[in-house]
Structure formats: C-alpha cells, structure tokens
Regions:
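Bacterial N-terminal signal peptides that target proteins for export
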Residues: 1-9
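C-terminal motif of bacterial Sec signal peptides marking the signal peptidase cleavage site
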Residues: 17-20
C-alpha cells in the first residue's frame, strides 16, 4: 500500500470517578449513567494491546456503575482482534490502526457492518536501553535502513560508523499488531513490509523486558508502555525532516511528532448496538475516555472529536472514515470527522 501524502499495561486507575462522577452524566453527554441500575449482560472486547489499557480502564469504571454487566477485555493484536470480530466472536474490537481492505472484504463476505470510533491519539515510540549513550536521535531514513525488508544492518556501526561495532538486537510487535502495520507503513512505505529477524511479540511487556535487559537493543511500541516503564528505557527522538522530536502529549496531539503519531480506535458491530449494555458502555466510553486515556498514558482527543465520535455511534454511521484503506500516514482525523458530519 502506498503511503498517503505526508502531512497506551493498565496503570493505577484513580478512584475519583466513584462518588464524584457517578451516577450523574456530565452536561452534553448521552446519559450513560442515567439510571438503569438493573442493567445486565456481557460485553466481549479483544484486539490491540495498545488500546487494551484504555478499554480495560473504561471497563473497570463502567462495572462499578453497572456491576451486573460483565465486560471482558482480551489481547490478540489488532489483526487477531479483527479476525474474532468479523467471525462474531467479539462485540467490540480494539484497533491501533484502521481496518484493512482485506478485513473489509471479510466483513462484506460475512455480512458484517460496524461503527468505527476513535478513542485517543498515540505516538509510536522508539526505545533503546538506558545504558545506550551513543544514540541521541534517529532519522526516518536511518529507521528505514534498519527495519526495511532485506536490511543489511546488523551492527550499530552499520547505521553510523562512529557507533559501536556491536550487534543490534531488534524488538517489535508481531505481524498481527496494528502498531507493526502502522510503523512499517510510516517508515518503510508499505504496511507489513519489514525484515523478519527481530524478536516479535504481541505483548508489549515482553518488548519492554527485552529492551530493558540488553544494552544493544532497539525496539518500538506505543507511547503509554514507554510512560509506564520510562525508568527502564531510553526514548529516542525521531527526525522526520524538521529536526529531532520526541513523542509527548503535545507533539503527538499537534502532529509534530511525525510520521509516528496516530489515532487509535474501537469498532462496534452494528448487530449488537441495540443491546442496552452495549449502548450504555459506548456512551460511557465516549464521555469518560478523556480522563481515563490520560490516566493510562495516552493522549485524549479534543472534546469536539469525542462528541463527533459519539454522534457517529448514536446515528449508526457505519464503515471506516478511512474508506477501509488501512493505515494512512499524515491524514488528519479532525478533518475526516468534520467532513463526514
């Protein structure tokens, strides 16, 4: 797939939502905690390890309000999550990239429609071991040189001659990961195109442990997992053409951390949207996400974008705002949502 024009481990959930926020809905919301104390049922969520902390945090707080609703949140990667979702094994799918054309074809074949809802922004973070004292930044071209298919880079000195003549140990998400898809699209110019000789895992904690335990390691994953483990890792600023920039809440939100800033999503199957527990859960998700997203280390959308996303759900607007085209680099979520509304 050609790149489009160029343009978060659950943290401790603060208990402030308890008596302060429940059960009264905030002004302008859709009434997620509006009263239905006898609401019951079950909701099954699976997919992205990146989105998992957000959905898990939302599920925990929702179940405090509605203890008779059982919400389970699993991890199988964005691609693995879509496989379950499109076979009707789950109600909601966590995704760290938009749905791919091949997945859209399966949805069409199985007669499945869905509503796509952005929930936060993330910045793919490039990490090294804290003992690494030679890397102060990497360029996009250097990342491509390291990660592209058929890469001949084996040692740090293959990237820059003055760097150590030591083997680079690479760590990254597996092929079912939306983070892997987005990174390869942004850096290598083709989704899924990468060298194969790296330690791959759908569990970001495995990647954290690997990089933290190896002086010569290099890897990437979502910003929240760096925030959760910043005492064990060293963040690498990336030069996308405007000088080295590190991911932060500000640079991710304003897009200056390019090309590795992205929106992340949940997908809801249309055929389950009428269930009362699903309706209330999604309304709660969209109205409370801003606070919970921050608590688990990601960057919230603006109030306007959460309102537009909730409107999308309430009106049952199906399909992807990315037209089923998968990862698209440099496309502004705000522009797409506003154009649709």
């Amino acid at each position: 797939m050609k790149t489009a024009f160029k343009a978060l481990v659950v943290g401790a959930i603060v208990g402030a939502l308890g008596s302060a926020c429940a059960p009264t809905q905030q002004a302008g919301g859709a009434g997620s905690a509006s009263g239905e104390p006898d609401l019951s049922g079950s909701i099954v969520i699976d997919g992205s390890s990146t989105v998992f902390p957000i959905s898990e945090a939302v599920a925990e707080e929702f179940q405090k309000l509605y203890p008779n609703v059982r919400v389970t949140v699993g991890i199988s990667g964005t691609g693995g999550g879509f496989k379950k979702f499109l076979n009707k094994e789950t109600d909601i799918s966590d995704a760290s990239r938009p749905i791919k054309p091949s997945e859209q074809e399966l949805a069409d074949k199985n007669g499945i429609t869905y509503v796509e809802l952005p929930v936060a922004f993330d910045g793919l973070s490039v990490l090294v071991n804290p003992q690494n004292d030679w890397v102060d930044h990497l360029t996009v071209d250097e990342l491509k040189k390291i990660w592209e298919p058929g890469s001949t880079v084996k040692r740090w000195s293959d990237v820059r001659p003055n760097w150590p003549n030591e083997e680079i140990k690479l760590y990254g998400p597996g092929h079912d990961s939306g983070t892997f898809d987005y990174f390869t699209e942004a850096i290598n110019g083709e989704e899924g195109a990468a060298r194969s000789d790296f330690m791959a895992s759908e569990d970001d904690n495995v990647l954290v442990t690997g990089i933290a335990g190896d002086k010569y390691a290099l890897g990437f994953f979502g910003f929240a997992y760096y925030e959760e483990n910043k005492d064990k890792l060293k963040l690498v600023p990336i030069d996308g053409g405007s000088g080295p920039i590190a991911p932060s809440a500000q640079t991710i939100m304003d897009g200056t951390y390019a090309p590795l800033s992205r929106p992340i999503f949940i997908y809801v199957r249309s055929d389950v949207m009428a269930r009362p527990e699903i309706k209330e859960f999604i309304r709660f998700y969209m109205t409370e996400a801003k606070n919970l997203v921050r608590e688990v280390g990601y960057v919230p959308l603006s109030d306007e974008l959460y309102e537009l996303a909730l409107k999308r759900f309430e009106e049952g607007v199906t399909g992807s705002i990315f037209a089923g085209g998968g990862s698209q680099i440099g496309v502004r979520l705000e522009d797409l949502l506003k154009a649709e509304s």
